[in-house]
Amino acid sequence: TMGSGAIASSAWLSACTCRTADRKTPAESREPDGSQMTYRANPNTGDRVSLLGYGMRRLPVEGGASGRENSDAPIDQEMVNRQVDYALAHGMNYFDTSPAYCQGRSERATGIALHRHPRSSYFIATKLSNFSPTTWSRRASQEMFENSLRELQTDYVDYLLLHGIGIGQKPMDEFYQRYIDNGILDWLVEQKSKGRIRNLGFSYHGDIRVFDLALRWHDEGKYHWDFAQIELNYLDWHYANEINPRNTDAEYLYDELHKRGIPVVIMEPLLGGRLARVPDYIVAKMKSREPEQSVASWAFRFAGTPEGVLAVLSGMTYMEHLRENLHTYSPLRPITPEEDAFLMQIADDIYNLKTIPCNECNYC
């Protein structure tokens, strides 16, 4: 979503001297220890979920790019298989996809990779991504769900989300048209009762009134949310609304979910990769405190520290990203109060640049 300084974000990225990647630290040069992965328990089901979740939105394509940006090159299925195998072998078990990801190819690629493993060894999260008005009818939305099962080669989804509640030109109207007026949310509740959906939740962007309505329904017992997915990182914790008045600070979103006991899945822990590419003077501050810790790992540790977080998603195109993130969560070293204060100061520094980068989520 475009922030108050987002028009200048490209200038921020190109004009300042930024580190685009850290050299591997000695720790990251070693093989990650899968036996040390941090897990969180889902209080609703008892699922033992890896704190690091695989976001299947930036799958590699032939030629080495990301399937999110390149609509022409085919998905590199062999590489997807290798990375999924590596993730599972090193303790990861949560894979998040959508009919909308990688120009509609993510679910199929994810299904091919995961189907080669025992179904009980992983959790699949996918979404009812009925963004287009052509998919708002009950029948079209039902078919989208059924197609997800076919593409993923499974007869049930572990975690099913209403995709992006709160977005659109008229967010409340679109929420009702996509999920309520057509009866599709009630139908999804019925599918859950049949075992075809194990956990039913939503991902949220945009209009806080829709988020608050969903939680009011939860409080009233009208609909029970088993989990929810929000954007959370150390910049958005206090500055999401300052950057863009359409957005809401992550602290509020997390607290509202956590006090209700709703497990939280985190997206955008790196703000679309931007928190791994900060100005050199911020890199220097981070390295002065933790010379062996990468810039990105600070953000991943922050996102994984709150006790109500079930999983932190990372869209990992390259094996090196997967390895580094496995190191960060095997096991997680929670952010200390002193480190939290340090990151809040870093967030102040970034915000005061007044060129806060767009995270390229494309929901706008």
Model regions: which residues?
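Short, acidic/polar
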Residues: 70-87, 137-151, 208-217, 295-300
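Aromatic/hydrophobic pocket-lining residues that form the small-molecule binding cavity
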Residues: 80, 106, 141, 145, ...
